[in-house]
A protein has these predicted regions:
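N-terminal and secondary-structure boundary signal
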Residues: 1-253
Length: 253
């Protein structure tokens, strides 16, 4: 069994569109099929664009909280307002960046992307777990194959140069593998080890999809070895309470 990754070429999208139909069209145009057990990894930004989750600077009205955030962290006022709207928790930050959480996703600036949006702000997709679930179900109904779906974003890792992929949502696969009670190479019983299956696969696909102008918003992973499931996955399964997170607890000292 050899893991393979097939990037899916697309054309640039700037407005709302039917995500599922576009995925089907692109997979066919790229000469790829989705087989039983494949994992389809989709860019979170691509999904956001399909939903129209784009803010024009001119449409953003400022709040006092946005003014405070802008002053404290030297952030553009319009971006500050978007961060306030999109965040459940603001942990702190540095000049130009605010560390936030929204729907159990911890990210700088609420995951808002302004790198390729021509002066506009691209927000995280609405209900990403529901989106992943719907795509998985539609592929089964139309093609009678069980596939996994991962929605990927790129993320900075603490004290590391560069970005890597992270799963902000998934469906059809078990997102975490519990390795507790198994043994390591020396025969020691593992007591706390969980393997982040969805995140690991997201990072593999993200490497092939790229971060620039590649126009590769999707990739298909074959022979991943991931465990398939029909149950509905929730964000709580891939996140831990912040009072148990070593990074958050360490920064609060």
């Amino acid at each position: 069994m050899v893991l393979e990754v097939f990037p899916v070429q697309a054309t640039k999208k700037e407005g709302k569109f039917d995500l599922y139909n576009e995925i089907r069209k692109l997979v066919k145009e790229n000469g790829i099929s989705l087989n039983e057990g494949d994992i389809l990894v989709i860019s979170s930004k691509y999904i956001s664009i399909s939903q129209g989750r784009i803010l024009d600077h001119n449409s953003i009205k400022l709040s006092e909280k946005a003014n405070e955030l802008s002053r404290e962290f030297s952030i553009n006022l319009k971006l500050s307002e978007a961060i306030v709207r999109e965040s459940d928790v603001v942990f702190g930050g540095v000049s130009g960046f605010v560390i936030t959480s929204s729907n159990n996703i911890m990210a700088p600036n609420a995951g808002i992307d302004k790198s390729n949006s021509q002066g506009k702000l691209i927000l995280y997709p609405n209900d990403p777990y529901q989106v992943a679930e719907q795509i998985k179900r539609k592929f089964f109904l139309d093609y009678h194959v069980h596939v996994g779906i991962i929605i990927v974003d790129s993320r900075l890792m603490p004290a590391r140069i560069g970005t890597s992929g992270v799963a902000i949502a998934c469906s059809g696969i078990e997102p975490v593998s519990d390795r507790r009670a198994t043994k390591d190479l020396d025969g020691n019983v593992l007591k706390v080890t969980f393997q982040a299956t969805a995140d690991n696969l997201a990072s593999i696909a993200n490497h092939k999809m790229g971060e620039g102008d590649e126009l590769l918003p999707m990739a298909i992973i074959r022979e991943s070895g991931a465990k398939l499931t029909d149950r509905k996955i929730s964000s709580e399964e891939t996140a831990i309470p912040y009072d148990e997170c070593v990074y958050v607890r360490g920064l609060k000292k």
